[in-house]
A protein has these predicted regions:
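Hydrophobic face of amphipathic alpha-helices that form TPR/SEL1-like repeat modules
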Residues: 1-26
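Glycine-rich loop-to-alpha-helix module at the N-terminal edge of alpha/beta enzyme cores
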Residues: 22-116
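Residue-level signal for inorganic ion chemistry
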Residues: 23, 44, 59, 164, ...
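Conserved small-residue-rich beta-alpha loop and adjacent elements
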Residues: 118-193, 267
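A structured beta-alpha segment of the ubiquitous adenosine-cofactor-binding alpha/beta core
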Residues: 130-132, 197-220
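Hydrophobic/aromatic ligand-binding patch that stacks against planar heteroaromatic rings
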Residues: 159-161, 210, 240
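Short beta->alpha connector loops at strand-helix junctions that form conserved
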Residues: 170-172, 200, 262
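ALDH superfamily catalytic-core signature
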Residues: 185, 190, 212, 218, ...
Length: 339
């Protein structure tokens, strides 16, 4: 755990193993209990006024520094952590934990400045100065993040922070290690204590603690539809005890598809079907799980598609000839095996 800028060792631990090498323990993780979660809520609330006072430019400077660090000396470290923790190939790690997160931090700052600059009042009567101020939520934001994108995991707590919010970061149990490395990066970039509090632990417990706190102000979530619906219901039940109406932002799963036109680029379609369905073992919300292909096109590409699928190599993420590696855990393996 990292609470108010300090590492906390609770003594309640779990291990993080490499998905493609179960005998290799990657990290021993100290899990947050209710006491640590309550302390994190308090730290986030106490840190908010100073974080607001830094101003938008000060906050953007910190997260643009995060992007610079990730584009530089931290790039290989974060990519390696993602390769080992989530069993991503070097290519998948690079487009995720480096490229996408660098873009998140830089574009978020760009658009935050745009909100501030572009929506100022057009007219101020003589003797009056009208202005618009970006105000954060009054309280803390709970960010519950997924395993499958290291970039999204860091974006969920940091996007609200850029506009002045403080909060709790509950990482997925399958990506504690890589997410912890990014928390260290943000601290090195100058993130003040208490702005983001890193809490590996039970999702049910952290939700219970957060919703019991009157200062709960928002949820930022990426994960399954069922879990998100359950959280929404719990927030609704908690409303009488909260100081404000929480903002709820969530992204959930889908059944993505590929539609082919009779005049399509058939080689391009073949590549799209292969990469869309099989890269990162299909563990993406953007993974292709259905295809609608005209019979004439299907007859032309079917044999090539089957042939290319048979050539896909699976194994250790450190072997750059492998296109696929392991799925994230036993539960995912059992689900796939049951199809």
């Amino acid at each position: 755990c990292i609470i108010n800028g300090e590492e906390v060792f609770t003594g309640t631990t779990t291990t993080q193993v490499i998905p493609h090498n179960h005998g290799h323990v990657l990290a021993n993780v100290h899990l947050a209990g209710k006491a640590e979660m309550e302390a994190a809520c308090e730290a986030a609330v106490n840190a908010q006024q100073a974080w607001i006072d830094i101003g938008l430019e000060g906050r953007c400077a910190i997260f643009e520094r995060c992007a610079d660090l990730l584009a530089g000396d931290w790039r290989m470290r974060v990519n390696a952590a993602t390769m080992l923790n989530q069993s991503k190939t070097a290519f998948q790690a690079e487009i995720d934990s480096a490229c996408e997160l660098i873009d998140f931090w830089r574009f978020n700052c760009h658009y935050a400045r745009g909100f501030h600059d572009d929506f100022q009042p057009l007219v101020s009567p003589e003797g009056v100065q009208n202005s618009t101020e970006i105000r954060p939520l009054e309280g803390f934001v709970l960010s519950i993040t997924p395993f499958n994108f290291t970039s999204i995991a860091a974006n969920l707590p940091s996007a609200p922070a850029i506009v002045g919010c403080t909060g709790l970061w509950k990482p997925s149990r399958n990506s504690y290690h890589s997410n912890y490395v990014l928390m260290q990066l943000m601290m090195e970039a100058g993130l003040p204590p208490g702005v983001i509090n890193f809490l590996p632990g039970s999702g049910a417990e952290i939700t219970e603690v957060a919703l019991a706190n009157p200062d709960f102000a928002g949820l930022h979530f990426t994960g399954s539809t069922a879990v998100f619906q359950g959280l929404w219901q719990e927030i609704g039940l908690a409303l009488p005890n909260l100081r404000s109406y929480p903002r709820i932002v969530g992204e959930t799963g889908g059944k993505d598809f590929v539609v082919a036109h009779p005049d399509c680029d058939r080689q391009g379609l073949l590549v799209a079907l292969l990469r869309g369905a099989f890269e990162y073992q299909g563990q993406k919300c953007s993974a292709a799980s259905r295809a609608y292909v005209p019979r004439s096109v299907w007859n032309a590409i079917r044999d090539d598609l089957v042939s290319e699928i048979s050539k896909i190599k699976m194994g250790d993420a450190r072997d750059f000839t492998n296109f696929m590696t392991a799925v994230i855990d036993q539960r995912a393996f059992d689900k796939i095996s049951g199809y």
